[in-house]
Curated annotation (Swiss-Prot):
Name assigned to this protein: Holliday junction branch migration complex subunit RuvA
Keyword Nucleus tagged: no
Assembly and interaction partners: Homotetramer. Forms an RuvA(8)-RuvB(12)-Holliday junction (HJ) complex. HJ DNA is sandwiched between 2 RuvA tetramers; dsDNA enters through RuvA and exits via RuvB. An RuvB hexamer assembles on each DNA strand where it exits the tetramer. Each RuvB hexamer is contacted by two RuvA subunits (via domain III) on 2 adjacent RuvB subunits; this complex drives branch migration. In the full resolvosome a probable DNA-RuvA(4)-RuvB(12)-RuvC(2) complex forms which resolves the HJ.
Family that this chain belongs to: Belongs to the RuvA family.
The organism's place on the tree of life at top rank: Bacteria
Notes on the domains: Has three domains with a flexible linker between the domains II and III and assumes an 'L' shape. Domain III is highly mobile and contacts RuvB.
Biological role: The RuvA-RuvB-RuvC complex processes Holliday junction (HJ) DNA during genetic recombination and DNA repair, while the RuvA-RuvB complex plays an important role in the rescue of blocked DNA replication forks via replication fork reversal (RFR). RuvA specifically binds to HJ cruciform DNA, conferring on it an open structure. The RuvB hexamer acts as an ATP-dependent pump, pulling dsDNA into and through the RuvAB complex. HJ branch migration allows RuvC to scan DNA until it finds its consensus sequence, where it cleaves and resolves the cruciform DNA.
Species: Prochlorococcus marinus (strain AS9601)
Gene3D superfamilies the UniProt entry points to: 5' to 3' exonuclease, C-terminal subdomain (1.10.150.20), Nucleic acid-binding proteins (2.40.50.140)
Any one GO MF annotation of this record: four-way junction helicase activity
Chain intervals for the UniProt region annotation (Domain III): 161-225
Any GO BP: DNA recombination
Annotated region described as Flexible linker, given as residue ranges: 151-161
Amino acid sequence: MISWINGDLVDLWQTNQKSFVLINCQGLGYEIQILESFFLKLKTNQISTKNITLWIKHIKKEDSDLLFGFTSKDQKNFFIEILSIRGVGSQIGIGILNKFSISEVINAIKTQDKKLICSVPGIGQKMSERLILELKSKFKSEILSEEEKSKDEFEIKDPEIIKMIEDLQLTLQSLSYKNKEINTILPIIIKEIDHLGKKENSLSFEKLLKLAMHYLDEDSSNKDR
């Protein structure tokens, strides 16, 4: 089994929306499917075509051997975890990593964002539900780590500001904004509170409400485009 390779680029091409490289490693040519982002960097000479190192997932089939190359071990391991899910093939795995970073996928799993997962070609509603369910158990520690990080980053200790945020949530709910939408913009508002608090002597509820509605309406208009 091939698990890692280092060599020089001989050729690169795309076919059927798949990206490939041919790597010369000690006189042998290895055809490897790679992520589109890495392909574009090679094509536009953003990175050297010499001494390319790829972490390889080697898949053996009856009639062929398939090599998938990744620029980091984390990408390779994430790809392997995706392939362990029933009904998910290699091209779905590549499609997910072509579209999102690992942290973006983990965040989508944490928030159960089926719409985001379904935006990957080949993934339907049922598969997105299965992916979220199974990956949530596989990446439990990563999800908990992200939640703790988020909690530490946005923890508020000032009782007056806590009360202001609670009032803001209730007011936005009374204005028919959904809880999911409100929770999405709260971290932004909390950052703004910190910024405004340093810049101005006092914070006004009216100013925060106006700011929150601006972000919510902007987010809504972007989704409608």
